[in-house]
A protein has these predicted regions:
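A short, Lys/Arg-rich alpha-helix, primarily the initiator
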Residues: 1-18
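Short, charged recognition helix plus adjacent turn
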Residues: 2, 62-78
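Residues within the helices of the helix-turn-helix
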Residues: 9, 20, 48, 59
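The alpha-helix within a helix-turn-helix
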Residues: 12, 23, 37, 51
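Short alpha-helical DNA-recognition segment
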Residues: 16-34
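Short, basic-rich loop-to-helix N-cap that marks the start of a DNA-contacting helix
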Residues: 40-52
Length: 78
C-alpha cells in the first residue's frame, strides 16, 4: 500500500504555513515529519492531529495510491 501526502503540502502552501509550524501546532515529532516527507505510513492519531490543526478532513491531506500488485489483484476480482 502506498500513500501520498502531496495534498497536505499543497494545503500548507495555500494556508501559508511551513512544515515547522505544522509540526509545532500538532506536537508531532521530527521523525514523524520525516516519514510524511517520504510518503511513508504514519499513525491515524498523527493524521487526526494534522486534520484538527488545519480544520480539514483526512481526505484533504492524504491520497491512497494502489501498488501494481494491488491493481492486478483488483482486476482479477472483477
Amino acid at each position: 500500500m502506498a500513500v501520498s501526502y502531496n495534498k497536505l503540502w499543497k494545503l500548507l502552501i495555500d494556508k501559508k504555513m511551513s512544515k515547522v509550524e505544522l509540526r509545532k501546532a500538532t506536537g508531532i515529532s521530527p521523525n514523524t515529519m520525516t516519514k510524511l516527507n517520504r510518503d511513508e505510513e504514519v499513525t491515524l492519531t498523527v493524521l487526526c492531529k494534522i486534520c484538527s490543526a488545519l480544520s480539514v478532513d483526512i481526505g484533504d491531506i492524504i491520497e491512497y495510491i494502489p501498488t501494481k500488485d494491488e491493481e492486478d489483484l483488483n482486476e482479477e476480482k472483477n
